[in-house]
Every structure is written in structure tokens, then in C-alpha cells.
A protein has these predicted regions:
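N-terminal secretory/targeting leader peptides
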Residues: 23-33, 42-137, 146, 153-349
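C-terminal motif of bacterial Sec signal peptides marking the signal peptidase cleavage site
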Residues: 17-21
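Short beta-strand-centered segments that line the small-molecule binding cleft or hinge
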Residues: 140
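Positively charged n-region of N-terminal signal peptides that target proteins for export
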Residues: 1-5
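Sec-dependent N-terminal signal peptides
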Residues: 7-14
Length: 349
């Protein structure tokens, strides 16, 4: 199904749901373009369905994690709750999907703290430069009362329910055709990033000039010299074949990125309590499993890029103290100092 067709289908689904109620099953996708879920629907009236989308390719490890989540939910719910997984932005652009979600449609999405920060500013701190440092810290924060309060505000004011933030991509580094080891040397470098304020401010604090481009245009942007490089985790960079268009991997490790899985509060509340628990538990389970696997796979992705000719400037050779000092500007610009202090207190830092 082409993106336009699926987006139109979702709009119609949303309109129908206003009359039929969000707890009912959405119309199935056209048989010629089924989503990547092996789940079979239970008898009508006993099944709930979530259409889950993301921007990544079918080859991305997270996509397989979402298929695992779908299968785990199907098995644990005896087929009463079905998740259909749509990669490659097939459900539409993120802004449109989140808007449909806010209206109560049975859609879910992979997003990040930067995007959620547009609704509740404090979320942005989770993607601020040199903030989180490890998967263990993410696990520790899964029961955070501070983040729980932010989630409550997001749900009450914007009808967006956080199911999990256990999907960790790890450290992001700069991939560029220019070599640099400190903020001064990065000055003037045009680096592709996402458009949310914390991305722009955080990447800008490294000394370079952030340029917002869609994820799918990253490779072409570097190839055509629209930008000098990008900032990504090793696995994502390798999947996009950035080694074909960038000479250097600068190990800034400026962001430690975890992603959020969200859905509509209205739709979530339409589920029986046992299905709500299954949905969340299986989401966390699949997220932690892929996060642990990606920690192991990062070294292999890095080596593949090195074998293709990328020169690595290792973390130990970067002036990290200078980068960290410069990153304070991002916290101040986005009013995140109090949020940082609250989370650091919970982490014992």
C-alpha cells in the first residue's frame, strides 16, 4: 500500500471511530499490501487492533523488535489483541500520525524524547547532550516518578500514552567528510539532524551548524553536499550506507538515544485491563531485548564501516570536556536544568 493510500485509510478509520468508538477493530489493510505481522484476527467483536508505524526500514533491528512485540502480544492475549507493523513511514509523516493519535485513532508510533518535548518540555532532557550514559540508567528510569509525572501530563493534556521507552539505539556520533576533535574545529560543518529543538540545540552546541533533513534524505544530502555529514548511531549509519558518502566517524557520543512507543490514551483506555498490561509488558520485553542485542551489534557495525574505508576518530581522542562544557548552552536555551537535576538525583549522579 502506498503511503498516500494508507494515510487516507487512517483518516477514514479516525472518522469512523468517532461514531463507532475507539475500542472497536479498525478496518483491515488491503490484502495486496499486508503489514508485517503474522497475527490472525480473532472473531469479530473480541479483537482489538493497533496499527503501529515507524520511519525505519525493514532491515533495521528495531523493525524486527516490533514484529517480536506483535507476536508476543498475540500469544499472550490469545489473539484478542493484534498489532500490525508498518515500516518506512507507511502510515504517514510523524506529525500526522500523532495528530490522529490525539484524536483517538487506534494507531501507535515510535517517537523520541525530542518529539514528546514539543508537548511536555521536560521530556527533551532525555535526549539532551551528555545526559544518559547507559542502558542500565534507562532501566533504572523505567520506574522514575519524575518521568511518570511527565507521562501523566502528556496523557491528560494531549491524549498520548507512553507504552515504553526501553528501545535504546545507543550513542550517536558524527559522520562527516571533515575531521574534527573539538567544538572549534567543528565550526562551519553542516550536519544533518532532526528538526525538534533539542536536536537542533544539542547538535549546534557541538560547534557545527545543524541542518534539518528527513531521515530518508540523509544519504543523498551528504552525497550531493547539501550537508557535510550527519549524526547517528553506528548501526543506523551502517544500515544507511553512510560509509559510501562520509570519510570520518567522529566519536562524540553526544546523545545516548532511547525511543518511545506511544499510542492514543483514548484507544488504550478502551482495552480491558488485562490487555493493557499485556501491551505494556510485551513492549518493554521486546525493547529491552533489542537494546541489549544492539549493544553487542554496534561493534560489528562499526567494523563494517571501517572495512569500507571510514577513518574513526575515537572517543578518547575527542575533547569531550570541551563538548560537555559547550552542551550547557542547550540545557539553558530549552529550560532543562531543573529536569536534569531531578533525573540526576534519581540516578544518584
Amino acid at each position: 500500500m502506498k503511503k498516500r493510500t494508507i494515510a487516507t485509510f487512517l483518516a477514514l478509520t479516525m472518522a469512523v471511530s468517532l461514531f463507532a468508538g475507539c475500542g472497536q477493530e479498525a478496518a483491515p489493510a488491503a490484502s495486496g499490501d499486508a503489514p508485517e505481522s503474522q497475527a490472525e484476527a480473532a472473531p469479530e467483536g473480541e479483537t482489538y487492533k493497533l496499527l503501529f508505524g515507524h520511519t525505519l526500514t525493514e532491515q533495521d533491528p528495531f523493525h524486527q523488535a516490533y514484529l517480536n512485540w506483535a507476536e508476543g502480544v498475540k500469544e499472550a492475549s490469545d489473539g484478542r489483541l493484534i498489532i500490525e507493523v508498518y515500516p518506512n513511514s507507511q502510515l504517514g509523516v510523524e506529525e500526522d500520525v500523532l495528530e490522529q493519535m490525539k484524536q483517538g485513532t487506534n494507531v501507535g508510533w515510535q517517537t523520541d524524547a525530542a518529539r514528546l518535548g514539543n508537548y511536555v518540555n521536560e521530556f527533551s532532557v532525555l535526549l539532551a547532550p551528555y545526559f544518559l550514559e547507559s542502558l542500565d540508567e534507562v532501566k533504572q528510569l523505567m520506574d522514575s516518578p519524575t518521568i511518570g509525572a511527565w507521562e501523566d501530563e502528556l496523557a491528560e493534556k494531549h491524549n498520548i500514552k507512553v507504552l515504553s521507552f526501553a528501545y535504546v539505539q545507543g550513542y550517536r556520533n558524527v559522520f562527516s567528510n571533515k575531521k574534527a576533535t573539538n567544538p572549534a574545529e567543528m565550526k562551519g560543518m553542516q550536519i544533518r539532524t532532526a528538526g525538534a529543538p533539542i536536536w537542533v540545540s544539542g547538535v549546534g552546541s557541538l560547534g557545527c551548524t545543524p541542518v534539518s533533513l528527513p531521515y530518508g534524505e540523509t544519504y543523498n544530502g551528504i552525497q550531493t553536499k547539501v550537508v557535510d555529514g550527519c549524526e547517528l548511531p553506528y548501526i543506523a549509519a551502517n544500515n544507511l550506507k553512510i560509509q559510501e558518502v562520509a570519510k570520518y566517524a567522529l566519536e562524540t557520543q553526544h546523545f545516548y538515544q532511547n525511543n518511545f512507543i506511544v499510542c492514543s490514551v483514548e484507544w488504550f483506555n478502551s482495552l480491558p485491563e488485562d490487555l493493557q498490561k499485556i501491551l505494556i509488558d510485551e513492549c518493554d520485553k521486546a525493547g529491552l531485548a533489542i537494546s541489549e542485542q544492539m549493544e553487542k551489534d554496534t561493534a560489528a557495525a562499526k567494523q563494517e564501516m571501517v572495512d569500507a574505508g571510514v577513518e574513526v576518530v575515537p572517543y578518547e581522542e575527542m575533547d569531550i570536556d570541551a563538548f560537555k562544557a559547550a552542551s550547557e548552552k542547550a540545557y539553558e536555551e530549552l529550560d532543562l536544568l531543573d529536569a536534569r537535576d531531578a533525573i540526576f538525583a534519581e540516578l544518584g549522579r
